Amino acid sequence: MRKGFVKEVLSKIKYDARENEEDYYIVIEHRGTYGNIKKIPVKMITLGHGYFFIEDTQIPYHRILAVIKKDGKVVWKKRGLGDEFKF
């Protein structure tokens, strides 16, 4: 996938009227949590250029491991993550 594609996926989820952002989560690499990953509802983030924000916290897009739906379907996954990686 090309660079910046995850931002395009998130933009579609947040701004396309056919999508409901409450149905989606992002999984990020988050040092200090169990397993170093954290699941965050897409409705809680604000998109920026090169970063996304959770309230006042700025997080780079490269920390996103996956975009998933509530039902567990993987919408986007970072290149290099095997199928055995569970979110």
Swiss-Prot record:
Pfam families: MJ1316 (PF04457)
Domain of life: Archaea
Family classification: Belongs to the UPF0248 family.
NCBIfam families hit by this protein: PRK04257.1
Name of the protein this chain belongs to: UPF0248 protein TSIB_1445
Organism: Thermococcus sibiricus (strain DSM 12597 / MM 739)
